[in-house]
């Protein structure tokens, strides 16, 4: 869905008015020595390969679902497509640079039918010299590996987001540009069939705006269990989340000030990050009935806060928003479009709000009869569910450690209950139900970067949300 014009303008109008080196220890125990200084804020994300280890032969890769490019009519401050049909080159370069700076391994672009339906498929992949186009068995280009210049690449796929979201298209749906647009903007079984026939997974964006009846009646592979746009858009907050329209926007203001003693701009999410029960309520209503993968949608457009922050970057930059959270997918082999979609459809993934700290060591699986069942899999009653809470990657010894908690939830028809809790869980003789894990964190370690009002932002928050394991 993205920003309807009025919604986007209301948020933009509101926001537009507001326009240390680490000390080295000498190894002594002199009590008069000053405490060590915290590390400088790290603007660039740590590559996944350096942050997360394999588990049982499964390699974690991080990425973005639900991202817009210049081919969306409202992206790039509404200036993505230029007169004459060219695209906003500066915005396209922002996107290419940001996926590398945010250390993503993959990005599923999901543009609005207006204008992505009008362009040939390869154009949607932003292929440039030095990239590695990905081809299918017949030689057609289906994806692109953007080169980061340091040996890393980021896998880019095309897709669309309107009422439904096609994730990982391998070609356009058939027809003329007008016919394609009509399909991409559809919301019925024929739309789902056409998207899947073009190689895509079908997911529900903006779940907060869908009724339980709609979700129960619609065929899809996954659904958003968090959407960043919804969390801050005044109209969606009021109409779909039951929240104060402008409270989130107001909470951003301290991060926009050019005050070196103020909070770090990259931590702006902490100003308005809160539990949004509408997502869990809808997801949990579906899980007892059928398998549905939960994903987090960044929904970045680079179109809401063009003013520069004190780090010299616009407030809603691709890099900044992409750093806030990722979908972590567990792969058994090479990172390919097909492998990614297979793992996502299976539910072998989890959501991590990495701006609170990169989670290292998270694990959730089932053990039964000598076999291991991964997230998204099915076990029979009587097996053991195993969950291990993560720790923060490379903690700063000068900072106060975070407080971490973990709960294992059992979801049955009309009921979500705590089945176990603790940093290490082994639940034996698991009863039937859909089981999912939530890890929460109180980010004391971020205090050095939150300025003079740090207590306002250091609060118990969602950190990791697993996909379910189903026990029959």
Model-flagged regions — what are they?
Residues 8-15:
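Sec-dependent signal peptide recognition
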Residues 21-23:
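C-terminal motif of bacterial Sec signal peptides marking the signal peptidase cleavage site
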Residues 25-28:
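Bacterial signal peptide processing site
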Residues 30-60, 64, 68, 72, ...:
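C-terminal functional module detector
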Residues 38-248, 260, 264, 273-281, ...:
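A metal-dependent hydrolase metal-coordination microenvironment
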């Amino acid at each position: 869905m993205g920003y309807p014009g009025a919604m986007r303008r209301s948020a933009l109008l509101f926001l537009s008015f507001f326009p240390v080196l680490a000390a080295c220890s000498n190894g002594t125990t002199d009590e008069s020595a000053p405490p060590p200084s915290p590390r400088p804020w790290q603007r660039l994300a740590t590559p996944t390969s350096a942050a997360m280890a394999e588990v049982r032969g499964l390699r974690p890769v991080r990425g973005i679902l639900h991202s817009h490019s210049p081919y969306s009519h409202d992206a790039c401050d509404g200036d993505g497509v230029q007169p004459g049909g060219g695209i906003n080159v500066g915005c396209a370069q922002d996107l290419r640079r940001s996926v590398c700076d945010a250390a993503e391994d993959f990005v599923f672009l999901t543009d609005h039918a207006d204008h992505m339906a009008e362009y040939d498929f390869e154009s949607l992949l932003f292929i440039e010299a030095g990239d590695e186009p990905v081809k299918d068995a017949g030689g057609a280009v289906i994806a692109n590996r953007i080169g980061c210049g340091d040996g890393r690449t980021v896998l880019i796929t095309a897709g669309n987001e309107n009422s439904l979201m096609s994730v990982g298209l391998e070609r356009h749906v058939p027809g003329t540009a007008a016919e394609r647009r009509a399909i991409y903007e559809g919301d019925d079984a024929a739309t789902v069939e056409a998207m899947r026939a073009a190689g895509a997974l079908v997911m529900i964006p903006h779940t907060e705006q869908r009724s339980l009846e709609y979700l129960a009646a619609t065929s899809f592979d996954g659904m958003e269990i968090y959407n960043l746009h919804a969390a801050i858009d005044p109209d969606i907050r009021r109409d779909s989340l039951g929240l104060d329209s402008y409270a989130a926007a107001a909470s951003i203001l301290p991060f926009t000030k050019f005050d070196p003693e103020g909070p770090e701009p990259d931590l702006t999410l902490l100003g308005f990050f809160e539990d949004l029960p509408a997502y869990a309520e809808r997801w949990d209503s579906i899980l007892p009935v059928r398998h549905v993968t939960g994903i987090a949608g960044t929904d970045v457009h680079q179109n809401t806060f063009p003013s520069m922050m004190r780090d010299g970057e616009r407030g809603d930059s691709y890099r900044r928003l992409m750093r806030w959270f990722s979908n972590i997918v567990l792969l058994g082999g090479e990172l390919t479009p097909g492998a990614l979609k297979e793992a996502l459809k299976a539910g072998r993934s989890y959501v991590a709000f990495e701006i609170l700290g990169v989670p290292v060591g998270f694990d959730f699986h089932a053990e039964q009869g000598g076999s291991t069942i991964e997230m998204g899999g099915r076990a029979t009653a009587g097996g053991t569910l195993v969950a291990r809470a993560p720790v923060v990657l490379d903690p700063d010894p000068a900072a106060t450690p975070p407080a971490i908690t973990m709960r294992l939830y059992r979801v049955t028809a009309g009921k979500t209950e705590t089945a176990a809790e603790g940093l290490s869980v082994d639940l034996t003789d698991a009863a039937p139900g859909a089981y999912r894990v939530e890890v929460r964190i109180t980010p004391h370690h971020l205090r050095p970067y939150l300025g003079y009002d740090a207590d306002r932002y250091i609060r118990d928050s969602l950190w990791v949300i697993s996909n379910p394991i189903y026990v029959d």
